[in-house]
A protein has these predicted regions:
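Anion-binding alpha/beta catalytic cores of soluble intermediary-metabolism enzymes, centered on
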Residues: 6-10, 15, 19-97
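Short, structured active-site "lid" loops
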Residues: 1
Length: 97
């Protein structure tokens, strides 16, 4: 896993698939790749298809408990991802199951 993440770090690849431990992949990614400024907790992200295109969802089961600071950080990461996808005015919402 470390070699795969280092390969991403060297800009030779943009992602990888692992059958390894999710916690290990997440921890190594945070250590080697870093996070956005002021982001303390990484979150899994997926693009979910909708009738109007797609929805970007973060923290898809990665954290058992999240406080208000974590939710704010998730919204910052979602907004950054939306900018990459050229979404100029993204809506941010909370879904709790």
């Amino acid at each position: 896993m470390r070699k795969a993440i280092e390969f991403i770090q060297s800009k030779n690849n943009i992602g990888f698939v692992s059958a390894g431990n999710t916690g290990a992949v997440t921890a190594l990614s945070k250590i080697l790749l870093g996070t956005l400024e002021n982001i303390k907790r990484p979150a899994f992200c997926s693009m979910i298809p909708t009738l109007k295109g797609f929805c970007i969802m973060l923290d898809l089961g990665a954290n058992k408990e999240s406080n208000e600071n974590h939710l704010l950080q998730f919204s910052i990461m979602g907004h950054a991802f939306a900018k990459i996808k050229n979404i100029s005015n993204p809506k941010v919402a909370i879904l709790n199951i």
